[in-house]
Structure formats: C-alpha cells, structure tokens
Design a protein with these regions (language model features):
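A short, acidic loop/turn at secondary-structure junctions
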Residues: 2-32
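Single-pass transmembrane signal-anchor helices and their membrane-water interface zones
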Residues: 24-37, 48-83
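A residue-level detector for the "anchor" residue at the start of short, highly conserved motifs
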Residues: 66-325
C-alpha cells in the first residue's frame, strides 16, 4: 500500500495544482446559477398558486351547487286539496311568500300554510276520501300530501273510505293518524285534545303510542300524559264541523241518500217508522238546492216538500215516517 501512495504523490506533483478560472468567468457562472435558482423559485410559486386557485374554485363550486341545489332542486309543490267551502275568509301563505286570500274551488299545495280568522271557517277536500274542516282561528301547514302541522285552532277530519287515505296531524304535543274515522284535533296551549266521533285513531307522543276509539276524548298533556273522557257522536261540540260541511247537491239524489248524509254530519242514525216510509225515501228523487243551510235546517226544508216527516225519538236518532203514519 505504501508503494501505491508514493506513486500517487509523484503523479500529483507531475500534474501540478489546478489553474484557477478567471474572475470574469466565475462571475458569469454565479450569475447563471442565480438566474436558474430564481426561475425554479418562480415555477414553484406558480404551481402553488395554481393549486390554491384550484382549491378555491372547488370550494366556490361546492357552495354554488349547494345554494342552487337547495333553491332549484328542492321538491316542487304538489296540489293536494281543493277548497270546497269558505264561511268568511281563508288565507294561504306559500313558503317564503306573502299571504293571499283563497276562494272556493282553488287548490292548496304542499308547503303552504292556510289560516282562518276568529270569525271564519273553511272546508277542503283531499282527493276523493278525506274532508278536512278548519274551525275559527286555525293555522295549519300542509307539510306533505299525507301530513298536516296544526299550530293553532282545530281540525275536523272525515274519512269515509274502506281503505282510507293516509293522513297524519302533528302538533307540539304529539301526532294523530286515523284508521277510517271522523275525529277532531284541537290545540289548547301546549295540550292536544283528540275527540273521536267514529272509527279509530292512533296517537303518538314522546311517551309512546296509544289508540282512541269512537266516543272517546283523549287529552295529551305537555308531559305526555294521556287523560281520557267521553263524547257522544251527536254532542253539540260537533256542530261547528257540521255547519262547515261541503255543500251537498241534492239534485238527482234520493231522499234516503240525503238522509244518510244528514245523519253522518250530525252524528245520528236514520230510523224509519215503517217499511213503507223507507221505500218512499228510497224512491223519491230530490230537486232544488240547500246551499247555505246547515244539515239540520236543510233536513227540515227538504222534508217539508215531501210526504214524509220527522217524528220525535231519541237524540241520537233521526226518525222518519209517512205523513199518513
């Protein structure tokens, strides 16, 4: 190894020291290196800016999609009911818009809130199955085709179909779903009172689910307690709903059909004094109009034009007899 080291040393002595480059060349090299370095820095900054702009653009795009999606991709309102009667004034307030007055035969759509004042009542028809009536001072929102949100006043619902249309009424105290029935939902401060005239309802609140049947009045307290009472189908408290019933067109209907309508609206049952009286009611076609009359007043007016009359019987019955009976 020592010999090798000597040879290397001799070789270096022969070559001599490396010549230093001229000063001008050193300055040119340094300037070129500095320029290249600055170019690299600028390229990196440009890439970072592109990345930042890309991220910002993505964020703006996401916000835009969310905004316009919420505005333009939300479900469109759907017409779900038609106004069949207004006694006084009925206001409708579409979501995000000012209120306007409604008229009979106009429609109500999902997302709209309808309201009666302290002197007005109204009736709506949901499809072919459900009659909805609003008492005085009622505010209700049509949340969807099968859900109403009641914040003030009272609703009366009459569903006559064998397979009733689904409909849920929600209040602060709980919700009510019917199973083919006639019933009323009324708000009292934070309470909810459900009166069942016919059929059955299901009531749900924070405490659980319970049912109500015909003849029951169920009060749901803010604590979720259920307090039960009784109410007759012909009780005077139902009078407001009967007086707000959609107008019944008697033309070309038999007297028997009209009597059944009166019975349903007043919570009574029709009984005939004889088979002859029943046959006469089934065969008699009616003509005329009862517009503006409540069911009881209309009954008296119609019977006065026939050979039949109403006889005195129990409060829950409508007794019909021939004048000759």
């Amino acid at each position: 190894m020592k010999g090798d080291d000597t040879s290397i040393e001799e070789l270096l002595l022969q070559v001599g020291a490396r010549d230093e480059p001229p000063a001008e060349m050193m300055l040119e090299v340094q300037a070129a290196v500095h320029a290249e370095w600055q170019s690299m820095l600028r390229a990196r900054r440009t890439r970072r800016q592109f990345i930042a702009v890309g991220i910002a653009a993505s964020a703006v795009l996401a916000v835009g999609v969310a905004f316009f999606g919420a505005r333009y991709m939300a479900p469109s309102p759907v017409q779900v009911a038609q106004i069949t009667r207004i006694d006084g004034h009925l206001l409708v307030r579409p979501q995000g818009q000012t209120a306007r007055e409604l008229a009979v035969a106009q429609s109500v759509s999902t997302g709209e809130t309808i309201q009666t004042d302290d002197r007005s009542r109204a009736a709506l028809q949901f499809g072919d199955q459900v009659s909805l009536r609003l008492d005085q001072g009622t505010i209700v929102k049509v949340a969807s085709a099968d859900e109403l949100v009641l914040t003030a006043g009272a609703l009366y619902i009459d569903s006559q179909a064998q397979n009733p249309q689904e409909l849920t009424v929600r209040t602060d105290a709980g919700s009510v779903r019917h199973v083919g029935t006639q019933y009323e939902v009324r708000t009292h401060a934070d309470d909810m009172v459900v009166s069942v005239r016919e059929g059955r309802v299901m009531i749900a609140n924070a405490a659980g689910t319970s049912s109500g049947v015909a003849g029951e009045e169920i009060r749901v307290t803010p604590r979720g307690e259920i307090v039960r009472g009784t109410v007759a189908a012909h009780d005077p408290r139902w009078q407001w709903a009967a007086s707000t019933a959609p107008q019944f067109d008697i033309n070309d209907h038999t007297l028997a059909v009209f009597l059944e309508w009166v019975a349903r609206e007043t919570g009574r049952k029709v009984v005939y004094a004889s088979s002859a009286a029943q046959s006469a009611a089934n065969g008699l076609k009616l003509r005329g109009s009862i517009v503006g009359l409540d069911p009881d007043t209309a009954l008296n007016a119609v019977l006065s034009t026939t050979q039949l009359h109403r006889y005195q019987t129990k409060d829950e019955l409508i007794g019909i007899a021939l004048t000759s009976d």
